[in-house]
Amino acid sequence: MKKADSLHLSRLAALGCIVCRNQNLGETPAEIHHIRTGQGASQRADHRKSIPLCHMHHRNGGYGVAIHAGRKQWERNFGTELQLLEQVQLELGVFYA
């Protein structure tokens, strides 16, 4: 991993879960979620196309709570991956195409 990617992922994690913050649940430790929108079945998105999610909103929360338990319902509940990516990029002051 490049140093710039490592720094970016550290800054992402330091934000805390974007969903918890949007729901006024306070700061929660974040894992890195590489967005799936526009990716092939077994491809991982570039590190710059990642959002910070707590373990509940990332993988453990169940249907409608965790993105990996049902992305379409999760996006109806919390916003699309691309909307949240745009928010994160604005907060970090970075903009990637």
Labelled PLM ranges:
Residues 21, 55-58:
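Cys/His-coordinated zinc-binding microdomains
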Residues 25-26, 37-38, 58-60:
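Short, charged/polar surface micro-motifs in flexible loops or helix N-caps
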Residues 31, 36-52:
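Conserved, aromatic- and glycine-enriched, well-ordered alpha/beta core segments
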Residues 41-48, 59-97:
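Polybasic, low-complexity binding patches
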